[in-house]
């Protein structure tokens, strides 16, 4: 979604303005009938309409800021990091996070450069459609929406197990049903309810993570019952996990590759911040990109560092049965340090995180499918909306994938979680890879037309090398992350590892013939990959430097801290 600013109106209270004005931008009419645009900014809210006059989104500025933060703190951080630690040890877990951080940096940089030059709706899917091929763009859109829908099933699959930290009197199926109905119903309300819920949940998550980092630092320094921990669990081979201890580097390399999938799932959603900043001024966008990296380093890398310091990789609680919360390294660190009350409080935070993540996945997936229907590559019934502007058919379609959560009732919860995580993470990898490919093509078109990147509103760092690096690494990981299934072939493991790639290729081929038929047009290379001279980098271009921006400096230390975080 693109946020814009209209002068001289303001959004919210004076306090809101001083904190959030960096996300307000100028109004630009749509470049075509399918674009979503800002119709008016008034009454302390941002109201977004599409060309049908049916879909309506009302989000206050404070909602948008906190949703941006909340997207960086999800279930992957609190749950899947334990699996990563047990597989690879603390050092390689940290290296995995730093490795994926470099990919996220490249992806957000690429999106920033493209989205500021051509601030169109539809995010990166439009860029793929313009500069790679129409069929590739449509396939990416479907895969991206599908990954959000799959993630909804993943969230439902673990919510009951997390609650079982307190009691197992109520069966898993009952908890899944309760939250299945609740989260689906919430997304059928006007979007202002979604914004309000996400605002408060993101506030809780932000406070909890910052508090846990402070707590972990104190425990490492000796505040816990075990005294100073320091690097105790990095000595005597503990730093490298079982692979290095048994001198089996092949096993260790496999564990590291598999661990990358966990890291990728944890990081997914960070690209949404760059998309939201698509029509920011150059100064505002640079700030937004810096904040993405700051959030990653604080909320992910720093948390992973302290997890590795406080929890040994071979702690039996990381892999024992009894529910995902009991496997969470955050809670294990608290229990090992002798803090009796905090695990219960933090478990409530994890429940809040799952509810927030499930709510967001249905919202994001439904809007993606709605946009695909507008573009003519999804059933038109997805355009059906309520009087309040909610695309209820797209919401119900996305939410239907929540039924996958019931798989935990008849299967091991960890196995089901890893199935869905792998499918969603691989789909996310494909999206990241084609964002980088789109940027490479974009830079090639600029060079062919003699347009210097120095004239762009925002120039990404380390390009084009960073984009090539991200594309090569992402596609390589996506291809090799399941190669172990060929040593001892298992149909279930093969399906889990590669179904996203298979589905993407099938959709790509299907849409190619949908657009070009089965005649000679279908076999022209120019329809497989758009020639540089035919790539459209003109539609939707706007000189953002001509717009005046009034971003007041923060007035106190709290506002300075808030602007860094939010």
Swiss-Prot record:
Gene Ontology cellular-component terms listed: membrane; plasma membrane
Membrane topology category: Multi-pass membrane protein
Superkingdom assignment: Eukaryota
Main location: membrane
Record keywords: Amino-acid transport, Cell membrane, Glycoprotein, Membrane, Transmembrane, Transmembrane helix, Transport
InterPro entries from the UniProt entry: AA-permease/SLC12A_dom, Amino_acid_permease_CS, APC_YAT
Induction of expression: Expression is regulated upon white-opaque switch. Expression is repressed by HAP43.
Transmembrane segments: 64-84, 88-108, 143-163, 169-189, 199-219, 253-273, 292-312, 345-365, 389-409, 415-435, 467-487, 499-519
Record has NAD as a keyword: no
GO terms assigned for molecular function: amino acid transmembrane transporter activity
Family: Belongs to the amino acid-polyamine-organocation (APC) superfamily. YAT (TC 2.A.3.10) family.
Function: Probable permease for arginine and lysine.
PANTHER family, per the entry: AMINO ACID PERMEASE (PTHR43341), ARGININE PERMEASE CAN1-RELATED (PTHR43341:SF4)
Name listed for the protein in its UniProt record: Probable lysine/arginine permease CAN3
Organism of origin: Candida albicans (strain SC5314 / ATCC MYA-2876) (Yeast)
């Amino acid at each position: 979604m693109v946020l814009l600013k209209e002068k001289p109106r303001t959004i919210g209270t004076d306090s809101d303005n001083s904190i959030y004005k960096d996300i307000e931008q100028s109004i630009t009419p749509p470049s075509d009938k399918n674009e979503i645009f800002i119709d008016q900014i008034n009454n302390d809210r941002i109201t977004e309409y599409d060309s049908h006059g049916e879909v309506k989104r009302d989000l206050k500025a404070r909602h948008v800021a906190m949703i941006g933060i909340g997207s960086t703190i999800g279930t992957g951080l609190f749950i899947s990091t334990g699996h990563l630690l047990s597989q690879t040890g603390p050092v390689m877990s940290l290296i995995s996070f730093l490795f994926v951080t470099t990919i996220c940096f490249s992806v957000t940089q690429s999106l920033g450069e493209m989205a500021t030059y051509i601030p169109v709706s539809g995010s990166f899917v439009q860029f793929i459609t313009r500069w790679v091929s129409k069929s590739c763009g449509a396939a990416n859109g479907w895969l991206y929406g599908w990954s959000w829908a799959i993630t909804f099933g993943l969230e439902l699959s673990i919510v009951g197990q997390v609650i079982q930290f307190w009691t197992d009197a109520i069966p898993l199926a009952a908890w899944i049903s309760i939250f299945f109905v609740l989260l689906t119903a919430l997304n059928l309300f006007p979007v202002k309810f979604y914004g309000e819920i996400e605002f408060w949940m993101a506030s809780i998550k932000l406070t909890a993570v910052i508090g846990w980092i402070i707590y972990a630092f104190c425990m490492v320094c000796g505040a816990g019952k075990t005294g100073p921990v320091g690097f105790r669990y990095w000595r005597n081979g503990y730093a490298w996990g079982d692979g290095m201890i048994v001198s089996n580097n092949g096993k260790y390399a496999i564990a590291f590759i598999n661990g990358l999938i966990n890291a990728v799932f944890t990081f997914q959603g960070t690209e949404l911040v760059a998309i939201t900043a698509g029509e920011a001024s150059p100064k505002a966008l640079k700030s937004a990109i810096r904040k993405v990296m700051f959030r990653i380093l604080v909320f992910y890398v720093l948390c992973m560092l302290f997890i590795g310091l406080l929890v040994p990789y071979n702690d039996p609680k990381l892999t024992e049965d009894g529910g995902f919360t009991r496997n969470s390294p955050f809670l294990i660190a608290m229990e090992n340090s002798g803090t009796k009350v905090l695990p219960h409080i933090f478990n409530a935070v994890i429940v809040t995180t799952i509810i927030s993540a499930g709510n967001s996945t249905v919202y994001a997936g439904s809007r993606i499918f709605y946009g695909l229907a507008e573009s003519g590559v999804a059933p038109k019934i997805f355009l059906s909306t309520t009087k309040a502007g909610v695309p209820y058919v797209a919401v119900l379609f996305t939410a239907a994938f929540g039924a996958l959560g019931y798989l935990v009732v008849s299967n091991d919860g960890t196995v089901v979680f890893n199935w869905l995580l792998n499918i969603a993470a691989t789909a996310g990898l494909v999206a990241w890879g084609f964002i980088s490919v789109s940027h490479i093509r974009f830079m090639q078109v600029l060079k062919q037309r003699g347009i210097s990147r120095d004239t762009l509103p925002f120039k990404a760092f380390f390009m084009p090398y960073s984009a090539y690096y991200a594309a090569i690494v992402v596609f390589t990981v996506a291809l090799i992350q399941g190669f172990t299934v060929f040593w001892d072939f298992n149909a279930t493991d093969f399906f889990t590892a590669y179904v996203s790639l298979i589905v993407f290729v099938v959709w790509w081929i299907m849409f190619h013939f949908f657009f070009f038929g089965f005649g000679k047009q279908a076999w022209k290379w120019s329809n497989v990959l758009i020639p540089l001279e035919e790539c459209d980098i003109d539609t939707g271009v706007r000189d953002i430097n001509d717009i005046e921006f009034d971003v007041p400096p923060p007035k106190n230390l709290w506002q300075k801290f808030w602007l860094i975080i939010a």
